[in-house]
Every structure is written in structure tokens, then in C-alpha cells.
């Protein structure tokens, strides 16, 4: 399996190269040359680690299959507490795919616990011995998951950049207290898009790359622009379908719809890949918060990033430039020149419009909707009072949209992307309770409401010392990168 850039089909690489490099030289994203076809029904009989190995090996064809089997087995075992890809019934034929039972309590763990192993193996496959400098822009969850996955990995340095005031206090503390000799964390003045743009500029700066190469350092990414982030996320769509099949809720071939709280479009795009591989996915429902740029695009075909930015209670979705949409545009149009033109228009004008036939093709699979802050709070309370189910703010966005888009007789799986204990004040307030200013006091009150303890890794943050408190401007991200030595 080869990969090529969404903006230049002539730039072909192996999966090892795609994972080690992260982003194509001209700024495009790597996509597979084809969609491998699998026996989805047979895969439904596997446990999660074996299922993960079976899916990722279809794309990572230059990796030793034995390595992938061992890597997935060691990744999705104890760290996920026996709940990797756990599907919880909520109401009728609506389910929650709980993706927050990993070490950092967010869905990003599924990729970022495996991805460090993939990077180290990629360098071995390529015969590369240089230091890898990973730059990560985060709206909250990716940063901690990447830090946890990559800390103290030999030959790797990682720097994470998050927007000041753009995460929950628990998310900030998860990053600021991170242990490890090879990690660094910076708050960036501005929003997530400012941080992400700053990181992308570093990746696209040939002078920076040349200077780092002199020091035997190469840049890479742990954001979902890196193929190594996307491929592990395909797996849990198969896992959700398998659980419904094995429980007798569906027969093989029945469609299942998925509603995904969406920011950077990577998680929902993984569902598109699962569908293209042969999994009977029906509709993929893109759920946005008040930063509803994707809802507008999927409705009109015009993407407009120049708009008011809202800080919401679902900060991991507070994004106006949704990077992975570029991959979908390539798959639908099949044209690197067309995609390059659209991305050029976005960079220069802040917007682009796709052809009507492109929008129609996208709408065959993708539906969309968005939730206001009031609706998010109402959804948290409704699920708690009506279904005895406690969810976080991002999941509530998806529950609200899922109810609007639910098809009669078709199961709906809502991707639950983070633990409610990562956002204790917002969840408590949604339940109609007065939340204390201190997040840990709020967490204790939420434990009483939930009837069970908060994840140990979150509760332990209260005792940890903060290591990182530097605040920088987006333009200083380049200075940070150039400050590294081999």
C-alpha cells in the first residue's frame, strides 16, 4: 500500500514514510492509494487487539505483521481496563461508544497509545536514526494523549501547544503536570486555529527543516493530519458494529448510523474509511457545537473559516479550520489539483466552494447538525434524568444532533469521546447544580451524582506539581522548534 499527497499525487510514500513524516512537503495530507476490502463479518468475531491488528495491517503493509499483532495486543490491554471499544446501551436502539476508558480519558488514546510504537518501528523500517521532534497543536485532548504516549520514548522530543483559556482546567492540568524528560508544553495566545496554523507553518518552512536537519533532527506530527493517528481510529467502528451483531441487535449487512462530535474531522473520517472497507455503515452524522463551520459546509458546499469564534463548554470542538476535511475532498473528487486549489483559496481568502456534484457525493454518506450551549446543557440533563446516563459536553453535542437525525429502525451509535469528569463544572451546571470554582471539588460532587468514582488518573492531578507555565505568541512556535538540539 502506497500513500500520496492530497495536493500532489506524484509524491508517493510508504506507510512508514507517511507516519514518520506526518505532512507532505507541499502541505498536503497523505492518503492511501486505495481502500482495502476486508471480510467485515469475519472481523466481527475478533477481540479488540486482534481486530486492531487485522485492520491496521491492511494499510501498514511495510510493517511486519507480527510486530503489529504484538503492538496492538500490548496497547489495548490493561491500559483500557478491559473496555476498549465499549458500547453502552442508552435508550432504545441508541448507543454510546465509550472511547474514554484509556489512560487520559479521551478517544485520542486509541491512536496515541499505539502511534509511538508505529513511529519507532517506522524509523527502523526506514533505517533512520535521527531525533524526531513532534509538534502538536491541541484543543485539549490530543495534547495530553500525545504527551502520555510519547513521554520518555528514546529518540523523540515532543512539544505541545494549546490555546490559552481554550481548554478545561482539568485538560490544562493534564498537560501542565506531564512527566517525562522529553516533553514540553506551551500555552499559545489565541485560539486552537492560531496554534494549529503556527504548527503548520513550521512544517511548511523549508529553512527550519534544513536547519534542524543539520542538527540531525526531523519534524513529525501527532495531530490527526498524520496518517498514524487516523488508522487506529477505524478499528472502533468495526468494534461497535461487532458488538451489535454479536448481541443479536442486528444481522450482518444491516446498516448502523454513527453520530460523531466533530472538530478536526479525523474521527468521523475514520468511519468513512471503515465504510469504504466494507463495514455496513449507513449515515455518518457530523455533530458540531456553535462553531458550526462544518454544518454550514455540509449543507451548502461553501466552507467559510472567517467567522465569529465561540469559546464553548466543548472546547475540543472549538475549531474553525477542519484539517481532515481535505482528505475527504480528495477521495470524493479524485483530483489533487482541485484540492490544492481549494486549500489555496482557504489560505488566501478564508473560504472555498466545492462543485455541486462534489457536495451531492458527500451528502450521500454524511449528514450534519449542530447544538447550542443551551441545548448541550439540556442534553446532559436529559440523558442523566431519563436514561441514568452521564455524559460529557462533547458527547452531549452528538446526542442532541443524533436525536434529530435518527432513522427509524436503524441503530444509532453516538461516539462518546471524553469522560464527563474532564469537564466537571460544565456537567454539574448542566445538571442544574451550583458548581464550585475548584474543578476537583466539582469532580467530587460529580462522583456523588454519577454514583461512582472519577477516573484515578484525573483525581490524581490534584496532587501533581505543575511543570509548564510558559505562554507564547503563535509566531514563537518556530522559535521553540529551532531551540532543539540533537
Give the location of each predicted region.
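PLP-dependent amino-acid enzyme catalytic core
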Residues: 1-486
Amino acid at each position: 500500500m502506497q500513500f500520496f499527497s492530497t495536493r500532489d499525487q506524484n509524491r508517493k510514500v510508504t506507510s512508514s514514510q507517511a507516519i514518520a513524516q506526518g505532512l507532505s512537503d507541499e502541505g498536503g495530507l497523505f492518503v492511501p492509494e486505495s481502500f482495502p476490502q476486508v471480510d467485515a463479518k469475519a472481523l466481527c468475531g475478533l477481540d479488540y487487539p486482534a481486530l486492531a491488528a487485522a485492520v491496521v495491517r491492511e494499510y501498514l503493509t511495510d510493517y511486519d505483521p507480527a510486530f503489529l499483532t504484538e503492538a496492538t495486543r500490548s496497547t489495548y490491554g490493561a491500559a483500557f481496563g478491559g473496555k476498549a471499544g465499549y458500547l453502552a446501551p442508552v435508550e432504545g436502539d441508541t448507543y454510546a461508544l465509550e472511547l474514554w476508558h484509556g489512560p487520559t480519558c479521551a478517544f485520542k488514546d486509541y491512536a496515541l497509545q499505539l502511534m509511538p510504537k508505529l513511529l519507532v518501528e517506522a524509523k527502523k523500517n526506514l533505517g533512520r536514526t535521527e531525533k524526531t521532534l513532534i509538534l502538536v497543536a491541541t484543543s485539549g485532548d490530543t495534547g495530553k494523549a500525545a504527551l502520555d504516549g510519547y513521554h520518555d520514548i528514546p529518540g523523540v522530543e515532543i512539544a505541545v501547544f494549546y490555546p490559552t483559556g481554550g481548554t478545561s482546567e482539568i485538560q490544562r492540568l493534564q498537560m501542565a503536570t506531564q512527566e517525562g524528560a522529553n516533553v514540553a508544553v506551551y500555552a499559545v495566545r489565541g485560539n486552537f486555529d492560531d496554534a494549529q496554523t503556527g504548527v503548520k507553518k513550521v512544517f511548511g518552512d523549508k529553512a527550519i527543516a534544513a536547519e534542524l536537519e543539520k542538527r540531525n533532527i526531523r519534524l513529525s506530527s501527532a495531530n490527526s493530519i498524520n496518517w498514524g493517528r487516523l488508522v487506529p481510529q477505524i478499528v472502533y467502528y468495526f468494534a461497535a458494529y461487532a458488538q451489535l451483531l454479536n448481541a443479536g441487535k442486528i444481522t450482518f449487512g444491516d446498516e448502523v448510523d454513527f453520530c460523531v462530535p466533530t472538530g478536526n474531522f479525523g474521527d468521523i473520517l475514520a468511519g468513512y474509511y471503515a465504510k469504504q472497507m466494507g463495514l455496513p455503515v449507513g449515515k455518518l452524522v457530523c455533530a458540531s457545537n456553535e462553531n458550526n463551520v462544518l454544518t454550514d459546509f455540509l449543507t451548502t458546499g461553501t466552507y467559510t473559516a472567517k467567522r465569529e469564534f465561540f469559546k464553548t463548554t466543548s472546547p475540543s470542538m472549538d475549531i474553525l479550520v477542519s484539517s481532515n476535511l481535505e482528505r475527504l475532498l480528495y477521495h470524493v473528487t479524485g483530483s489533487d489539483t482541485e484540492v490544492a486549489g481549494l486549500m489555496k483559496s482557504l489560505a488566501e481568502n478564508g473560504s472555498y466552494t466545492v462543485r455541486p456534484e462534489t457536495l451531492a457525493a458527500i451528502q450521500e454518506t454524511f449528514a450534519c447538525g449542530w447544538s447550542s450551549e443551551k441545548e448541550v446543557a439540556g442534553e446532559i440533563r436529559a440523558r442523566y434524568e431519563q436514561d441514568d446516563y452521564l455524559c460529557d459536553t462533547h458527547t452531549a453535542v452528538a446526542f442532541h444532533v443524533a436525536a434529530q437525525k435518527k432513522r427509524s429502525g436503524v441503530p444509532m451509535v453516538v461516539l462518546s469521546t471524553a469522560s464527563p469528569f474532564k469537564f466537571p463544572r460544565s456537567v454539574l451546571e448542566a445538571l442544574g447544580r451550583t458548581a464550585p470554582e475548584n474543578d476537583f471539588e466539582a469532580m467530587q460532587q460529580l462522583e456523588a451524582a454519577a454514583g461512582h468514582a472519577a477516573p484515578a488518573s484525573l483525581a490524581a492531578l490534584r496532587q501533581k506539581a505543575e511543570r509548564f507555565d510558559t505562554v507564547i505568541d503563535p509566531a514563537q512556535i518556530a522559535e521553540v522548534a529551532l531551540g532543539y538540539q540533537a
